[in-house]
């Protein structure tokens, strides 16, 4: 159930999230495959899409080509946008191979212990999730699994925030 609310949608969410739309996003540490580390707060002033994924997740594998085509290729050169794939509980080599297998060009980062994931989702919650964060660091939209209608709404939210 979605209700329009200024830039995003409010969502009644019982899908395993421990955060909600309107919350300040937890300031997680993001570790790139080259070892570079950043805090989520380093991206303040940008629209950020966090994409939680894993190579063993069939739904993730189905969704990621759409993220590549409909979001990343459209916005990758926009200095006000960041897309960060976060690979749950896999090592560097697995993460790099996962990106190659799916021909993903957006950054896939490491979350070997699930610290980033469990800052947003409950223990035992499923992995296919996207979180859109506004320039002030607030959560404005969240998805669970891959639903084409919800994915389309997420694309609209990103487009509006970048207008």
Give the positions of each predicted feature:
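N-terminal "domain-start" segment that seeds a small globular fold
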Residues: 7-40
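Alpha/beta-hydrolase fold active-site loops
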Residues: 47-48, 81, 128
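Short active-site neighborhood of thiol/selenol oxidoreductases, capturing the structured segment around
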Residues: 38-61
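Thiol/disulfide oxidoreductase modules built on the thioredoxin-like
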Residues: 100-105, 111-159
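Short, small-residue-biased leader/transition segments that mark boundaries at the very start
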Residues: 1-2
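Short, ordered coil/turn segments that flank beta-strands lining enzyme active or ligand-binding pockets
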Residues: 33, 43, 135
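Structural microenvironment flanking redox-active thiols in thiol-disulfide oxidoreductases
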Residues: 61-102, 112-119
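Conserved hydrophobic packing residues within short motifs/helices of P-loop NTPase cores
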Residues: 50, 84-86, 131
